[in-house]
């Protein structure tokens, strides 16, 4: 009898081909949606991001059928910060990370409840919208106007974004979140695009990578966030010249050892196989990297017992590295994994569903506009 996927022997040597244990990763993501280790308790206010890693991971593995989509959709909508009846909290709207405030369960079917400490978080709005699209929702209960108003309130004068209205760190991560939100809602009125573009451009460092902000150290994660944001805006080649793009390409391609690191002289880490790999894909030079070494590194961090991936070999797996490890393998067209949309960070199937959704909105708006013209005449 042939060995099953989980029983096949494998080696860890550089020259041996390691197995991708798909079924174990499916079970790992299932557990992330059901019960989490105690060490995750500090992430309670960011629970929606963990849900994103698990749901998008299952989507990448074509295994969303193992979850109750309707229940999760209702839970996500219950995290939407809606306008109150007097609309006094528009600048605080979006999605919160979990039900930590104890506000009554409301899956976006009634007006919002006023609470002095309740507000959306830019990363939770990004992951919340992503999860809804991944699960096949049509976003009909998303208050788009309020989400965009809340997003506009988070942009600072230098073009960057903070996470919450009370103020927080402001850097390239949140510029990317804002770009994804506008792209998914098909409405760029949520930001001053010119200011955001200037912020990205000013973040280019002396060594040609992109930093979290002007004058800071280049980083693989912030380079992805900046380049992906410009791609979502459709502005990449307007912002950087061909010469500058070639320099960015060189900086990125120099990040590979076997896997990728995020900064010079730092250890290789599984997640950068996506952050840097996706940037190289967007810059159209990923094909010049060493796929075999990258694949072997990612799979060396795979937990063969419980599933998932860690940042380093012989470390504990976690939801973030499990997801980005799979996305990194997807860039190399690993068997059993769906294709990833490198800028939006979801499966291409989900990005195509989103495109169809945008088209349906456009058709609906055109029809409504025609009806209004007919009534007025």
UniProtKB/Swiss-Prot annotation:
Among Pfam families, the record links this protein to: Prenyltrans
Protein residues bound to Zn(2+): 269, 271, 321
Catalyzed reactions: geranylgeranyl diphosphate + L-cysteinyl-[protein] = S-geranylgeranyl-L-cysteinyl-[protein] + diphosphate
Q: How is the cofactor bound?
A: Binds 1 zinc ion per subunit.
Keyword Isomerase annotated: no
The keyword Zinc appears for this protein: yes
Q: Which InterPro entries match?
A: GGTase_I_beta (IPR041960), PGGT1B-like (IPR045089), Prenyltrans (IPR001330), Terpenoid_cyclase/PrenylTrfase (IPR008930)
* GO cellular component terms attached to this protein's record: CAAX-protein geranylgeranyltransferase complex
Q: What are the record keywords, sorted?
A: Magnesium, Metal-binding, Prenyltransferase, Repeat, Transferase, Zinc
Positions of geranylgeranyl diphosphate binding: 219-221, 263-266, 272-275
The record describes its quaternary structure and partners as:
Heterodimer of FNTA and PGGT1B. PGGT1B mediates interaction with substrate peptides.
Q: What does this protein do?
A: Catalyzes the transfer of a geranyl-geranyl moiety from geranyl-geranyl pyrophosphate to a cysteine at the fourth position from the C-terminus of proteins having the C-terminal sequence Cys-aliphatic-aliphatic-X. Known substrates include RAC1, RAC2, RAP1A and RAP1B.
Protein name (database record): Geranylgeranyl transferase type-1 subunit beta
């Amino acid at each position: 009898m042939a060995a099953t996927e989980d029983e096949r022997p494998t080696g860890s040597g550089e020259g041996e081909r390691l197995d991708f244990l798909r079924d174990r990763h499916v079970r790992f993501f299932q557990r992330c949606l059901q019960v989490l280790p105690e060490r995750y308790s500090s992430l309670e206010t960011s629970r929606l991001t963990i849900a994103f890693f698990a749901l998008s991971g299952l989507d990448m593995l074509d295994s969303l059928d193992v979850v109750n989509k309707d229940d999760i959709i209702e839970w996500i909508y219950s995290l939407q910060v809606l306008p109150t009846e007097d609309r006094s909290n528009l600048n605080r709207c979006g999605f919160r990370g979990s039900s930590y405030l104890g506000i009554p369960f409301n899956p976006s079917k009634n007006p919002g409840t006023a609470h002095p400490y309740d507000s959306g978080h830019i990363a939770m709005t990004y992951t919340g919208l992503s999860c809804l699209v991944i699960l096949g929702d049509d976003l009909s209960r998303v208050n788009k106007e309020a989400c965009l108003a809340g997003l506009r309130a988070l942009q600072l004068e230098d073009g960057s974004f903070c996470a919450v209205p009370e103020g927080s760190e402001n850097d390239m991560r949140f510029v990317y979140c804002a770009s994804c939100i506008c792209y998914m809602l098909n409405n760029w009125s949520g930001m001053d695009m010119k200011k955001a573009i200037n912020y990205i451009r000013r973040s280019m460092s002396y060594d040609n990578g992109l930093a979290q902000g002007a004058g800071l150290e280049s980083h693989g994660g912030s380079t992805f966030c900046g380049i992906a944001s410009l791609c979502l805006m459709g502005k990449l080649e307007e912002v950087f010249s061909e010469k500058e793009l070639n320099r960015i390409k060189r900086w990125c391609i120099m990040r590979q050892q076997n896997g990728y690191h995020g900064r010079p002289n730092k250890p290789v880490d599984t997640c950068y196989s996506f952050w840097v790999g996706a940037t190289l894909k967007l810059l159209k030079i990923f094909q010049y990297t060493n796929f075999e070494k990258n694949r072997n590194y990612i799979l060396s961090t795979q937990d063969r017992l419980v599933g998932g991936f860690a940042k380093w070999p012989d470390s504990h797996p976690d939801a973030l590295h499990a997801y980005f490890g799979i996305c990194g393998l997807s860039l190399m067209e690993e068997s059993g994994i769906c294709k990833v949309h490198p800028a939006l960070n979801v499966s291409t199937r989900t990005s195509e569903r989103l495109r169809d959704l945008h088209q349906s909105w456009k058709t609906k708006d055109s029809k409504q506009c025609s009806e209004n013209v007919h009534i007025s005449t």
